Amino acid sequence: MFKNLRLLGFFHFFFIGEFMSHYFRNDPNLISEETTYQVEMFDQKFTFLSDKGVFSKDHLDTGSYALIANLDIPTHAKILLDVGSGIGVIGIILKKVHPNLDVTQIDINTRALELNIKNNKLNQVETTVYESNLFSHVDKTFDCIVSNPPIRTGKATIYNLYKDAYKHLNTYGQL
C-alpha cells in the first residue's frame, strides 16, 4: 500500500509538477491562450483578459470575491497596495469603486502584469503596475495593503508578506 503511495507521489511530481506552470513563477515558454471573463460587483460589470500561467485564469476565485466584497477601505486611505495582484482584478475593482484612491499593484509574474496593464485600459482605470517579488521593489508606504496571498508558495512566503507589510504601512495603515 505505501509503495503505491510513493509511486503516486513520484508520478505527481515527475509528470505533473515538472510540467505544470505555476502562477507565482514566470514561464516564458508557456504558450499564450488569452481569454476573457466577466465580473459583476457593486452594480458594475468588469471584463478581464486572462491567460494560461496566471492565477484563477477563467473566473474570479471565491477568496478574491469575498475579499473585495468585504473589504472596508478606511476613510483616511489615499494610497493602496495590492500585493500579488495577478491580472489586476482586486486593484482594478477597488480603483473603480474608490476613484480617488491611488492604487499600486505588484506581482512577480510578468504575464500577469502585462494582462493587468491591458485590464486597466479595458476597465478604464489607471493604477500603477510593476514587478516585485513581495516588497523587494517597493519603496513607498501605504494607507492600506491588500492581498489574496499565493498560498501555494508555502508558509515562509506568506509569513514574509505579513512581516514586511508592516514596514510599508503608514501610521494607522491597515493590512
Predicted regions and their residues:
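Positively charged N-terminal leader segments that act as targeting/secretion signals
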Residues: 1-10
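N-terminal auxiliary segments of SAM/dcSAM-dependent transferases
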Residues: 11, 15-42, 53
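Residue-level detection of beta-strand-connecting loop/turn positions
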Residues: 43-45, 52, 124
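Conserved SAM-binding loop and adjacent beta-strand
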Residues: 51-68
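Conserved SAM/SAH cofactor-binding pocket of Class I
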Residues: 63-138, 144-147, 153
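Glycine/threonine-rich flexible loop motifs
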Residues: 155-157
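A short glycine-rich, Lys/Arg-flanked "PGG" loop and its adjoining helix->strand segment in the class I
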Residues: 160-171
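Conserved beta-strand signature within the Rossmann-like core of class I S-adenosyl-L-methionine
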Residues: 173-175
